[in-house]
């Protein structure tokens, strides 16, 4: 694991082992009994899986010092996006297709959404 010290690698592997044990301690329920009994067992199993997932997230975040999930990418507002069609409009050229640019000024692509 690049960029880490050996100690933190060992701690991370230990945390992964703990998480694996947690998931192995909650096997999927057997398909026996009445429909209602099976449904109840699956419902309880899903609740335990949810708890295990939350515990696993807490273990990983304490081990890594940050959340396990990546930070979502911030996208620019839609009002600033437009398709640049000034060079090759209607020619069918491949290089003009799908090229969107962000401009400094605001272009209205669609109306305000109200019907007139």
From Swiss-Prot:
The modification Phosphoserine is found at residues 5, 8, 99. Residues 98-116 have a biased composition (Polar residues). A motif (Nuclear export signal and binding to XPO1) lies at residues 73-84. Residues 26-48, 89-116 are annotated as: Disordered. It is found in: Host nucleus, Host nucleolus; Host cytoplasm. Asymmetrically arginine dimethylated at one site by host PRMT6. Methylation impairs the RNA-binding activity and export of viral RNA from the nucleus to the cytoplasm. Residues 18-26 are annotated as: Homomultimerization. GO terms for cellular component: host cell cytoplasm; host cell nucleolus. Keywords: AIDS, Host cytoplasm, Host nucleus, Host-virus interaction, Methylation, mRNA transport, Phosphoprotein, RNA-binding, Transport. One of its GO terms (molecular function) is DNA-binding transcription factor activity. It holds the Pfam family REV. Residues 36-48 have a biased composition (Basic residues). GO terms for biological process: mRNA transport; viral process. A motif (Nuclear localization signal and RNA-binding (RRE)) lies at residues 34-50. The RNA-binding motif binds to the RRE, a 240 bp stem-and-loop structure present in incompletely spliced viral pre-mRNAs. This region also contains the NLS which mediates nuclear localization via KPNB1 binding and, when the N-terminal sequence is present, nucleolar targeting. These overlapping functions prevent Rev bound to RRE from undesirable return to the nucleus. When Rev binds the RRE, the NLS becomes masked while the NES remains accessible. The leucine-rich NES mediates binding to human XPO1. Homomultimer; when bound to the RRE. Multimeric assembly is essential for activity and may involve XPO1. Binds to human KPNB1, XPO1, TNPO1, RANBP5 and IPO7. Interacts with the viral Integrase. Interacts with human KHDRBS1. Interacts with human NAP1; this interaction decreases Rev multimerization and stimulates its activity. Interacts with human DEAD-box helicases DDX3 and DDX24; these interactions may serve for viral RNA export to the cytoplasm and packaging, respectively. Belongs to the HIV-1 REV protein family. Escorts unspliced or incompletely spliced viral pre-mRNAs (late transcripts) out of the nucleus of infected cells. These pre-mRNAs carry a recognition sequence called Rev responsive element (RRE) located in the env gene, that is not present in fully spliced viral mRNAs (early transcripts). This function is essential since most viral proteins are translated from unspliced or partially spliced pre-mRNAs which cannot exit the nucleus by the pathway used by fully processed cellular mRNAs. Rev itself is translated from a fully spliced mRNA that readily exits the nucleus. HIV-1 lineages are divided in three main groups, M (for Major), O (for Outlier), and N (for New, or Non-M, Non-O). The vast majority of strains found worldwide belong to the group M. Group O seems to be endemic to and largely confined to Cameroon and neighboring countries in West Central Africa, where these viruses represent a small minority of HIV-1 strains. The group N is represented by a limited number of isolates from Cameroonian persons. The group M is further subdivided in 9 clades or subtypes (A to D, F to H, J and K). This is Protein Rev. It comes from Human immunodeficiency virus type 1 group M subtype F1 (isolate 93BR020).
């Amino acid at each position: 694991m690049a960029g880490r010290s050996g100690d933190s690698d060992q701690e991370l592997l230990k945390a992964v082992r703990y998480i694996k044990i947690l998931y192995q301690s909650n096997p999927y329920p057997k398909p026996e009994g009445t429909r209602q009994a099976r449904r109840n067992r699956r419902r309880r199993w899903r609740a335990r899986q949810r708890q295990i997932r939350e515990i696993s997230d807490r273990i990983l975040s304490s081990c890594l010092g940050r959340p396990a999930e990546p930070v979502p990418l911030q996208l620019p507002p839609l009002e600033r996006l437009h398709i640049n069609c000034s060079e090759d409009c209607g020619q069918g050229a491949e290089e003009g297709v799908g090229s969107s640019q962000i401009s400094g000024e605001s272009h209205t692509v669609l109306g305000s959404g109200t019907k007139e």
